[in-house]
Amino acid sequence: MDIYTYKKHILFKKCFLYFWKIKNVIKKKNTKKFNQIVLSLFLGGFSSFSILYCVQSILPVFSKQFCLTATESSLSLSAATATMSIGTLFIGPLSDRIGRKSIMSSSLLIAAVLTIICSISNNWTVIVFLRALTGLALSGVVAVAMTYIVEEVHPNSVSFCMGLYISGNTIGGCSGRILSSILAEYFSWHIAFIVIGFFSLMSSCLFLYFLPSSKNFYPISIDFNKFLKNFYLHLKNPTLLILFAIGFMLMGSFITIFNYISYRLMLSPFFLSSSNIGFLSIIYLTGVYSSPKAGILINQYNRSSILRIALLLMILGLLMTQYNEIFIIILGLVIFSSGFFASHSIASSWIGFHAKIAKVQATSLYLFFYYLGSSIFGTFGGFFWFYLKWIGISSFIIIILIFAILLSLKLKK
């Protein structure tokens, strides 16, 4: 059994056990409303992130078909994450006015339709533009889903529901990458977009039908002066600024590595197919373990020390990818990803401790910088690939992570 067949077998086994466990937990909750909420939000998170990240594993396919550099091809993802980062700042307050469910449902529907339209285009500029609109639409789910959970779910069940939603995000992003890489290899990227688009369209209809309307939502008017003032206060907070910068560097590093590792593995001495490269997305599931593990460790040890250890793990994993052995590269990516998810978990959870007012807006700012880092570094890394190949990418990311470690030294427990 080769390593890819083995990884596929492990994936299907873990998914079966995961969903069996979820089924039993949901059964214990035993309320129709709760079941509808968790399953709808899982589906919403799954669809959103499968749309967002379906392009990442097929960037070399775009490069070949449209005669693009790696930098230009990465715009299909960077354009979406850039507009999504901007949308997260403003969609939240808009949902305070017109409602949570309507924002999320319309966002999913629009994103699905845009993905289907994207599948029939053969103009790269149009595709990037449509992807930018798709990212803006998806910000309606990213920025609102967690607020809906806090408002509508009993406090004792919030953690489980939040975890299931985040699992939907992770598994959706992983599945989108795998499915698009397989369909692009055996059919075309057009077919990949059509399949993912229509699946998401059906998901948005099920989401709209099954998700209960908000019972604890009360519309409020938007006070733009207060809105901008809160942003200003957060940006004046030195600790929050450091956390925003670390989030910016974390996501930028993570996306850059997975944007360009596919180009490396398609070359000598690996010559991997796009579908095999797509299955590397299974590595993302390391976050299911490392994120909660980091949460346990920061309650026992110094939070900033655990953050620095996680960042050092990312550097260690990245150094391992310099070898020309596929097993060592995969192991390096696993270590790198584990460090990333642990670091992100620590940094994002720290926001609430230092935001004294308007914590939702503080979280929105973190997400803004988080996805902005994905857009900027994810595209800028292409220049390092063009001139220096993988050693250039690795050096670029290691420098970024060293800066993140230096910034973390200024953080107190």
Swiss-Prot record:
- Keywords assigned by UniProt, alphabetized: Cell membrane, Membrane, Transmembrane, Transmembrane helix, Transport
Report the transmembrane regions from the record: 42-62, 75-95, 109-129, 133-153, 157-179, 191-211, 238-258, 265-285, 304-324, 326-346, 362-382, 383-403
Q: Which family does it belong to?
A: Belongs to the major facilitator superfamily.
Q: What is this protein called?
A: Uncharacterized transporter BUsg_567
The family database entries (PANTHER family) matched by this protein are listed as: BLL2771 PROTEIN, INNER MEMBRANE TRANSPORT PROTEIN YNFM
Question: Mind telling me which InterPro entries this protein's record contains?
Answer: MFS (IPR011701), MFS_dom (IPR020846), MFS_trans_sf (IPR036259), Sugar_transporter_CS (IPR005829)
List localization entries.
Answer: Cell membrane
Q: Which GO terms describe its molecular function?
A: transmembrane transporter activity
Q: Does the keyword Cell membrane apply?
A: yes
Question: What Gene Ontology terms describe where this protein resides (cellular component)?
Answer: plasma membrane
- SUPFAM superfamilies, per the entry: MFS general substrate transporter
Q: Which domain of life is it from?
A: Bacteria
| Membrane topology note | Multi-pass membrane protein
